[in-house]
Amino acid sequence: MPLLDSFKVNHTKMPAPAVRLAKVMKTPKGDDISVFDLRFCVPNKDIMSEKGTHTLEHLFAGFMRDHLNSDSVEIIDISPMGCRTGFYMSLIGTPDEKSVAKAWEEAMKDVLSVSDQSKIPELNIYQCGTCAMHSLDEAKQIAQKVLNLGISIMNNKELKLENA
């Protein structure tokens, strides 16, 4: 079975928080779809809390759209990684990593400004599959850590696994 692209990079060398352009694909009509690795935690060293990750999932995509979407960029989806060390963001267009990092930073500031749990979008039994599994406090802790550490840019060449 062929390796997925995410398993072709050396996770022991990944910095965090950091942005990595994981892939660019062309649609049949010629549009670019970019996939970004938004790494919140150093793999195998740290992990985002379950409730904090879930709450970020509800907040992050909307805030990133506010700061990154434009005439040439439209976010399709932002989803948490199963390992809980980050999120994958798929979008139409090819923004540079610095623009993505700036939008991510602004989105984390937005998370810190959410006044209370009732302000989390889609936090109800009709729109969320596990609506009891949220923590705004934990999401804010994750956001504050990102802001405190600063967001860097990953270099794919430095991360490439030898035989992948």
From Swiss-Prot:
Cofactor binding note from Swiss-Prot or TrEMBL:
Binds 1 Fe cation per subunit.
Function of the protein: Involved in the synthesis of autoinducer 2 (AI-2) which is secreted by bacteria and is used to communicate both the cell density and the metabolic potential of the environment. The regulation of gene expression in response to changes in cell density is called quorum sensing. Catalyzes the transformation of S-ribosylhomocysteine (RHC) to homocysteine (HC) and 4,5-dihydroxy-2,3-pentadione (DPD).
Reaction(s) catalysed (UniProt annotation): S-(5-deoxy-D-ribos-5-yl)-L-homocysteine = (S)-4,5-dihydroxypentane-2,3-dione + L-homocysteine
Q: Report residues binding Fe cation.
A: 54, 58, 128
What are its cofactors? Fe cation
Q: Which family does it belong to?
A: Belongs to the LuxS family.
Q: What is its EC number?
A: 4.4.1.21
Q: Which NCBIfam families match?
A: PRK02260.1-2
Which keywords does this chain's UniProt record carry?
Autoinducer synthesis, Iron, Lyase, Metal-binding, Quorum sensing
Q: Which domain of life does this protein belong to? A: Bacteria
Q: What class of enzyme is it?
A: lyase
What's the name of the protein? Answer: S-ribosylhomocysteine lyase
Tell me the GO molecular function terms. iron ion binding; S-ribosylhomocysteine lyase activity
Is Phosphoprotein found in the keyword set? no
Assembly and partners? Homodimer.
Task: Give an example GO biological process.
Answer: quorum sensing
* Keyword hit for Lyase: yes
Q: Which InterPro entries match?
A: LuxS_sf (IPR037005), Metalloenz_LuxS/M16 (IPR011249), S-ribosylhomocysteinase (IPR003815)
